[in-house]
């Protein structure tokens, strides 16, 4: 096997007992690959390990976990200054793995690891909210956010992405739309939104294609708003992604401003952010990510 530069795997602490992963790493090490492993325990660990990775001179920092872990690692990478910033590799080990699935990362651990180490590094966009918090995949608001943030961890562990839908059906009687106003380049809308999706990536909530036209290297954010007076018909239309549905409003812009008369919550790659005013902007070519050659989210 050809020689490859060293990599550092930042592993979510929930995956430390993953025996197949341990075996895959040992096998690649036996084949001559240098793979450092660090385990996260609390918020801030990923940023410290990215700094350590730079001191070690590795070519790739691999995010081993779900969308939240990918978010933490990618955010730490774009905050690095100087040259020789490592590329991002992705090892999907979370509940839904929405970003990894949509960009075509293999499910098999050994194949995903090899791609993360030796795949072609391509410049991709990220998004930033209120000049502080970032997301690589999607910001979701309204119905979808309350479901994903409130779904019990045990239910997610047992059922994966389906758990979000089940929990949503159980909470139908308490869910209300969010009144807000959204502006962007050549875009303006105000009204009651049941679901808001602002995507750099395409899917969230365990596989739902909220922004099916999104690309991760086009310098744009895709917006989809689901409106309507009734939760269940709108949820069904969300699952079907019916392009002719009058309750679906779409837009594309390099930025969006959102204002609400009351506090609303957005879910940024799994992390909630609450407020009444949000400025969301794209950060073009913010980092390099090792992706498969047939990645469907590249233009």
From Swiss-Prot:
Localization per Swiss-Prot or TrEMBL: Cytoplasm
Domain DAGKc positions: 2-133
Main enzyme class: transferase
Gene Ontology biological process terms from the UniProt entry: phospholipid biosynthetic process
Pfam family, one: DAGK_cat
Annotated Mg(2+) binding sites: 215, 218, 220
A GO MF label: magnesium ion binding
Chief location category: cytoplasm
Keyword tags: ATP-binding, Cytoplasm, Kinase, Lipid biosynthesis, Lipid metabolism, Magnesium, Metal-binding, Nucleotide-binding, Phospholipid biosynthesis, Phospholipid metabolism, Transferase
Recorded GO CC terms: cytoplasm; plasma membrane
Function text: Probably phosphorylates lipids; the in vivo substrate is unknown.
Family of this protein: Belongs to the diacylglycerol/lipid kinase family. YegS lipid kinase subfamily.
The protein's name in its UniProt record: Probable lipid kinase YegS
């Amino acid at each position: 096997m050809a020689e490859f530069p060293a990599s550092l795997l930042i592993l979510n602490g929930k995956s430390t007992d993953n025996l197949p992963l341990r075996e895959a790493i040992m096998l690649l090490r036996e084949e001559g690959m240098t793979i450092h492993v660090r385990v996260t325990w609390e918020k801030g660990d990923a940023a410290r390990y990215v700094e350590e990775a730079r001191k070690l001179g590795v070519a790739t920092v691999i995010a081993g976990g779900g969308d939240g872990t990918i978010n933490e690692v990618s955010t730490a990478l774009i905050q690095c200054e100087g040259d020789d910033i490592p590329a991002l590799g992705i090892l999907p080990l979370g509940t839904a793995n929405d970003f990894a699935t949509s960009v075509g990362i293999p499910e098999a651990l050994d194949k995903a690891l090899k791609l993360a180490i030796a795949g072609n590094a391509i410049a991709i966009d990220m998004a930033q909210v209120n000049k502080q918090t970032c997301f690589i995949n999607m910001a979701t608001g309204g119905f979808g956010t309350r479901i994903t943030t409130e779904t019990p961890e045990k239910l997610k562990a047992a059922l994966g992405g389906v758990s979000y839908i089940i929990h949503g059906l159980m909470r139908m009687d308490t869910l209300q739309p969010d009144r807000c106003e959204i502006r962007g380049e050549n875009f303006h809308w105000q009204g009651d939104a049941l679901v808001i999706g602002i995507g750099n990536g395409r899917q969230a909530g365990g596989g739902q294609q909220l922004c099916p036209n999104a690309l991760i290297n086009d310098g744009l954010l895709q917006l989809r708003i689901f409106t309507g007076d009734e939760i269940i018909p709108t949820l069904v239309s969300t699952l079907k992604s019916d392009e002719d549905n009058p309750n679906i409003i779409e837009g594309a812009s390099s930025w969006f401003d959102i204002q609400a008369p009351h506090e609303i919550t957005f879910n940024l790659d799994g992390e909630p952010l609450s407020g009444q005013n949000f400025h969301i902007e794209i950060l073009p070519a913010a980092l390099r990510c090792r992706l498969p050659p047939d990645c469907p989210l590249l233009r």
